[in-house]
Amino acid sequence: MIFRLGDFRFPDDPARLYPDTPDRPWVLEIGFGDGRFWPHYARTFPEPPNYLGVEISGVSLLKAHRRLKDAGLTNAVLTKLPAEVLVAQVIPHGSLDAIIVNFPDPWPKAGHEDHRLLRVPFFQVAASRLKPGGAALLTTDHDEYFEFACAQAEASGVMRVERVGPPPAALETKYAQKWRDLGLGVNHARFVPTRHDPVPNGTFAPYSEEDPAVPHAVLTLPADFSPQHFDKLTVRGKTWTVVLLDLYATLRRGGWVALAHVVEGDLTQEVLVGITEREDGTHLVRLAKFGGPIITPGVKAAVGAVTEWLEGQGAVVKHRGY
């Protein structure tokens, strides 16, 4: 199955994701590429563990989905998200048996270390998400990143580093085959939690059809409200940035829709905020369901930014629910 961010719960329950195999081990692979690793690795178990794969490439997502389907691996969920968001928001405490990272982007240029996945904050969250006895597994051809990751794991205070040989399946990935053909080796380490300090999952919420749960406002627009142009507007908070990109008139139902770009750390969402007339003549400003948005502080701020822009056009706010 392919999941959007909005298809998950925060945190989610493995029994909900894998209703037919709820008691099997749960493995997360970060950066699965074209999906070659998991069919090989799953065969080393008596029964295929429940699999969750995260990738940022849409092309890779489709290739891996076909490969896992052809292999008959039905207890697999794939998603296109930043890995940091998935691990922090979706995975419950003490639920994973393994986290697998094969050939991650090393971000080799000077000053780009902050873009690397395997840093102290990630290891601290990973230790919380792994079960006792679980581990994070890294395989990489990049020597400097390997040493960097090992040092970061040790500096996290919650991981022990074990430098061992990689599982054979890790050598079947596209990049492993490339380096093997060139006669080059790979590095592998197991990062084993020494503590499982709880790390909260955060404040994400799925879109709900219940009105009180969806960010909204009720207001009265001026009788002559008929916008002919819209200037891009940027609003910044402590943990988010909202950019109102444009305003569109809707033809079928009347009203308008604002397009907002919302950035919160590693998570970026583009959401629609509708402006529709109600039976009593007031207008409802409300986050639209289109695209499966996740309700976050930044998304609430986007609804607030649209509401405040409308106030600047002469609207009178009757109620704020964001």
Curated annotation (Swiss-Prot):
What are the protein's UniProt keywords? Methyltransferase, S-adenosyl-L-methionine, Transferase, tRNA processing
- Give the active-site positions: 105
Signal sequence, renumbered to the chain: none
Top EC class of this enzyme:
transferase
The annotated pathway is: tRNA modification; N(7)-methylguanine-tRNA biosynthesis
Highest rank taxon of the organism: Bacteria
Q: What is its EC number?
A: 2.1.1.33
Give an example GO biological process: tRNA methylation
* Reaction equation(s) it catalyzes: guanosine(46) in tRNA + S-adenosyl-L-methionine = N(7)-methylguanosine(46) in tRNA + S-adenosyl-L-homocysteine
> Quick one: which residues bind S-adenosyl-L-methionine?
29, 55, 105
Can you list the GO cellular component terms from the UniProt entry?
A: tRNA methyltransferase complex
Gene Ontology MF annotations:
tRNA (guanine(46)-N7)-methyltransferase activity
Q: Does the keyword tRNA processing apply?
A: yes
PANTHER family the UniProt entry points to: 3-DEOXY-D-MANNO-OCTULOSONIC-ACID TRANSFERASE/TRNA GUANINE-N 7 - -METHYLTRANSFERASE, PENTACOTRIPEPTIDE-REPEAT REGION OF PRORP DOMAIN-CONTAINING PROTEIN
The entry's family comment says: Belongs to the class I-like SAM-binding methyltransferase superfamily. TrmB family.
What exactly does this protein do?
Catalyzes the formation of N(7)-methylguanine at position 46 (m7G46) in tRNA.
Q: What name is this protein filed under?
A: tRNA (guanine-N(7)-)-methyltransferase
Q: What is the lineage of its organism?
A: Bacteria, Thermotogati, Deinococcota, Deinococci, Deinococcales
Recorded name of the encoding gene: trmB
